[in-house]
UniProtKB/Swiss-Prot annotation:
Protein name per UniProt: Der GTPase-activating protein YihI
Example GO biological process: ribosome biogenesis
Ranges of compositional bias, category Acidic residues: 146-155, 166-181
Family label: Belongs to the YihI family.
The organism of origin for this protein: Vibrio vulnificus (strain CMCP6)
Region of interest (Disordered), residue spans: 1-75, 145-181
Phylogenetic classification of the source organism: Bacteria, Pseudomonadati, Pseudomonadota, Gammaproteobacteria, Vibrionales
GO function terms (MF aspect): GTPase activator activity
Gene symbol of the encoding locus: yihI
Amino acid sequence: MSRKKKSRKPGAAGAPEFMVTRNRSESDVAGRLRKKDKKRKGLKAGGRNSEEGAQQKHGSSQVRDPRLGSKKKIPLIVEPAKKLTKQERRLSAEQELEMLENDAKLNVLLDRIESGENLGRGLQQYVDEKLDRIEQLMSQLGLLEPEAEEEFEEEAPVRKSRSDDDLLADFEDFDMDDYKG
């Protein structure tokens, strides 16, 4: 069969029966919007340069040159660090004592020791160091009470040094019959 050429005459086969006519400007606007949406699917290009635009939105109205540094004055003479006063040292010692008393790890280890558990060498050393520091801080702050051992030594009767004659007299007066059963 031979091929038929399409004709351009109206009313030819395959041609729509009615034509839809649109306003040209409306069609142009719709087409541009579709094209715009299609173009802007990804991220914006030029990530290096976008920082300047973001800074202008957030920053002040004055444009700053990033090459200029800080205007803060730097002292040319180094002043020695000031020493803490007695009250400041005492306050810091109180704070350190408070921290040590509230130390969760130390409290857990002390509870384990009280329950009769033996700690490893490292943990025992940690506990000893912390307790020594607590004792040192308490004595520094004047919170440490005298220990019981010191009280016993003070309560012991004080004996006068006795001469040899007194000791010999006690020995001679000693009665062995009192101890026989």
